[in-house]
């Protein structure tokens, strides 16, 4: 039997239902889910994580859909992908990565895998699906 490996990646700072939704959808794209947790110093597209790197890996690893979790490479985000050799890279519905850009980088490295984007989770009225929004709410309510 052929096993399909899927890679999901993200910051995963202050876990919320949107993260769980993304990881469940990613897991459904294959058999084994590998999650690459971004190093704090590599998060440049938004505010740096509040939660330390190792703690974020530990929290992600504890989630049911996740088979393996690891910290991303310090210098090259594609190193873990080369090591895992996934069949699918699952992007979150709102992640800043462009599918075409990832596909081009994979082609340049001789990596043959599909790039797919997970769908959004519909938030209920009282649900917060963003780490930034959670932090804002904490600051508002605790100030």
UniProtKB/Swiss-Prot annotation:
| Cofactors that this protein relies on | a divalent metal cation
EC number(s) given by UniProt: 2.7.7.2
Name the residues that bind ATP: 11-12, 16-19, 94
This protein's pathway: Cofactor biosynthesis; FAD biosynthesis; FAD from FMN: step 1/1
Q: Which family does it belong to?
A: Belongs to the archaeal FAD synthase family.
Query: What is the originating organism of this protein?
Result: Halomicrobium mukohataei (strain ATCC 700874 / DSM 12286 / JCM 9738 / NCIMB 13541) (Haloarcula mukohataei)
Q: What name is this protein filed under? A: FAD synthase
| Annotated NCBIfam families | cyt_tran_rel (TIGR00125)
SUBUNIT field: Homodimer.
Where are its TM segments located?
A: none
Q: Which GO terms describe its molecular function?
A: ATP binding; FMN adenylyltransferase activity
């Amino acid at each position: 039997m052929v096993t399909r490996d899927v890679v999901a990646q993200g910051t995963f700072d202050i876990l919320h239902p949107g993260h769980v939704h993304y990881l469940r959808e990613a897991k459904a794209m294959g058999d084994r889910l590998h999650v690459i947790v971004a190093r704090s110093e590599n998060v440049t597209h938004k505010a740096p994580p509040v939660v330390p790197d190792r703690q974020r890996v530990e929290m992600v690893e504890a989630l049911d859909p996740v088979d393996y979790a690891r910290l991303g490479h310090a210098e090259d985000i594609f190193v873990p992908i080369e090591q895992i050799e996934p069949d699918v890279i699952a992007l979150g519905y709102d992640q800043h990565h462009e599918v075409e850009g990832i596909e081009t980088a994979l082609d340049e490295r001789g990596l043959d895998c599909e790039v797919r984007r997970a769908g959004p989770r519909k938030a209920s009225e009282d649900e917060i699906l963003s780490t930034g929004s959670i932090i804002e709410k904490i600051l508002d309510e605790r100030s």
